[in-house]
Amino acid sequence: MFEFDFSDELKTKIALLLKRDKKRVEIINKKVREIISSDEAAISRYKNLRRELKHLKRVHVDRNFVLTFQVDLEKKFVLFVDFDHHDRIYSR
């Protein structure tokens, strides 16, 4: 089990999304629970990103949205960084 936190940017996005699309927020919460309940070997199944995002991993939420997160295996800590449309995440 991992400890976790959300970035300030992600907290804002989830708060806004809660007003517009509660179902997507429920899906995000389900993915967060899935990730933090993983063990160290299972967390490696999530895709590592490349280039300037290489310190992040990602998981798809719904069909076109991505939740990015950073894992510190030594501290057993996950920082959820961003949630956005697939095209906007990768255009950075």
Feature map (PLM): residue ranges:
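Enriched for short, Lys/Arg-rich terminal
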Residues: 1-3, 12-25, 61-92
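Residues that form or immediately flank small-molecule/cofactor binding pockets and catalytic motifs
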Residues: 9, 54, 85
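N-terminal first-folded block
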Residues: 9-41
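Short alpha-helical linear motifs
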Residues: 30, 50-54, 69-73
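A short, surface-exposed loop/turn module that caps and links secondary-structure elements
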Residues: 34-59
